[in-house]
Structure formats: structure tokens, C-alpha cells
Amino acid sequence: MKNLGAAILAVICLQYADSAAVFDRNFTKPYVLKKTWVQNFIKFQYIFEGNQGKAKIVPLGCAPTNVDGDNYLKPGERTFQHDFVFSCEEGEDGVLNYEAIACIDTQGEIMHPGETRSLSNGTVILHCNLYGGALKKVVERAAGCYFNETIYPEEEKWVEPQVNPNDTSIDGRLMQCFRPHYSYYESHVVGCVIGKLGVLIDEFGQLLDGSYVKCVESEFGHVSLKSANVDELACTMDNKTYAHASQWTDVKKGANMRCNYRHIVKESCVLGTEILPIGQEVPVSRDCIFLCHPQTNVYICDNSLEEFKIVESNGDDLGPVEENKIVEKLPENKKKSLKSVFKF
């Protein structure tokens, strides 16, 4: 009976060994099964192989719970655990590794390393990346405004589709990224887009057919183009009215001016008989440098000019220097040049 019992036990052990995938790997027979244990998420087993009963440690697979049990991953298998996709991989040297190979976003979708997701209407970005050799999920506030898988920095503009399908006057909305009071970034509607033409809110533009339009905001976030008369584009300066696209020379300011969609634009400077482009510097008398500035003429002098004196804030400004003489100029309302119409 004792010999019969030992034979039955040996048969059972051999049947169990044949069913285990681990024994498809490289080692010799006969062998004897011993205990299993888990260390660092890898499940191991002692065996004794060969006629001499040599002890050997065999890695069976990966244990996601880090606890010894019947359920474990075999090499090449994967599992979803703790916001990551883990894989049990066997290296060329036969060593098993249990590691995260991908992230899982808030919707349960797989994020591969290097991918990002936008959260909270684009104000927060979720990253899936390798940090210090390990795959991690990192959430950070977006350094800009998010739209269509793109982050736009502060003050940058982009085009979004029209939100009102019944309005055919525009093809899209011109958006711009703002960061009020150094808080979160916000995207605001700043203009209308038709074709490749963009017009800021309350500004004017000209369509391909020659007609003029004005971009208006009917309600918050909704813009449209309205027909405009060319007279609405005129400019006013020193109690004079100038038609849109007209040009003239202002002798007092020493500048050539142009009326552009209701805004006065300084095109060049006039210094004596010379016409200087915006931004050019030239040496002038009294060891000074003259800078043609887009808003006001600038004289840069290292030496003291005795004829200059400090005046009250409501006093007369000084005009251009002509033949080393100071020419007084009446106060005026300074106009700031704005670029209201641009091409994409």
C-alpha cells in the first residue's frame, strides 16, 4: 500500500508539472515542485532538477497585487491597474520586469508615453511621460489657452468655427488668449473672420467685392459683420476730416500721415527735404541723433541744450528742431496707431 501511495503521488506531481507553462522553459528533468513566493511583484518558485536534485529558482510571472496567489501574469500579458497599463515582460537575460507601459486618462482611454489630455475646459493638462526612468501621470495648469489639441500662449490669436450656424456673414471667430490679473488663462472673442480676412470687434474691413463691413459683437461671444459706409472710415485730426486711404503731410509734426480705417497712421518722417522711413536713425546738428518713431519724433542728445527748459504739464510741447531753432507747437490730442485689419 505504501508503494502504491507513493506512485500515485508521483503521478499527480508529474501531471501538475506538465500543465504549468513555466516548465516549457529551459531546465532538465526530473524535477520536484517546491514552494512559491512573491518579491517586488515577481512570483518565484523553488524546484530541484536533475538526478542530483540541484536547487533552482524559477520566475513564474508577475503578481500585480504583490501577494502570492493563484492569479498572476505570464510573460507578455498585460493588466489595467491604478491608472496605468502594466505589462509582464521578459528580458533577453530571462529576468522578468513588471512595469507600467501606458497611462489611463479620466475617460478610461489609454495614453501612450508623450501624449497629453486637456481637462477643465483646457485650463489643466494631463501628461503621460517618463520621469526619472518611471512612467508617471502629471497634471499641470496650461501655460496658455487650449483649443483643438493646441496650446496658444498669452496674446496669441487663432480662428475658431462660427458658433451660430444661421449667421452666414462670417466664416469663423477670431480668438485671443488673455491672462487677467496673472490668474488662469482665458480665451476671448476679439474679432470676425471671413475667408483670410480678420477684423477686430468695432473695426472695419473691406471684402473682395469692394464693400466695407464692421465687426460687431451682438452678444457676449457672438460676433457678426455688418455693412458699413465709407464715410464711417474717415479720420479726424486738428479739427480736419480726412477720407479713408487719403494721405497728407503734417508740417508741424514733420510726418507723412495716412488715414486707415478711421485710424491715423504715421508712414514716414520729414526732416527738411529728407523723407525718413519709420525706425531710421540719422545724425543731425548739435551732435544729436534723430529717430523716426511711429508715434512721435525723437531727438537723442548727449550734450546739454541750453535753449531747452522744463515746462508745466499743460504747457506747449516742443516741435521739430529746424536750423537749430525751437519751434513751438500747439497742444494736440495724440492719436495712437492701431492695426485693425490684417491678413492671415
From Swiss-Prot:
InterPro entries: Mig18_Fn1. It holds the Pfam family Fn1_2. This is Uncharacterized protein B0280.7. It comes from Caenorhabditis elegans.
